[in-house]
Amino acid sequence: MSFVTQLLEIPGHSSPSVYLLDAREVDLDQTTLRATARALSVGGRYSSRSYRYPFALVAVHEDRVGVDIERTTSWEPQMFRSILTPGECEPHASPSKHEWATSVWSSKEAMAKALGNPMDYDPRRLESPLLWPPGGAGRWQASTLPVPPGHVGWICWQPLFVGTRIR
């Protein structure tokens, strides 16, 4: 499929495979884009999808994984504060930094998806992977994704370690 680009696959490092779908390449409507993304997501034990038409991200992995793509947008100060943990409310954390604010939200959305049901997690209690130390947090890894300009993309996953049994 020429409208699908593989964004991430590091052989031997137990990382997920991530694909970017661009509906503009083959003139897909939203419904067909979503159906195509669902079809791509059957390749692993776990999968995650995110949509911001005309784009979709799909991640497949043998362990937990979450992916998110967001269009960079302006943030109202009250809305921005409603997604931050107390530790994220630093002077540099400003809603006027639209890409940073969108990246905080996208990273939290990807993490919540990797944990299970994103609706179960309050963003004010979920630390953004954007602020994690290098190497991740515990067993979790996270990375930004090279998505089209004007968008932010994140992936969070649990890497498989040597000796991990796949059922």
Model-derived features with residue positions:
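Core catalytic alpha/beta fold that binds nucleotide/phospho-ligands
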Residues: 1-167
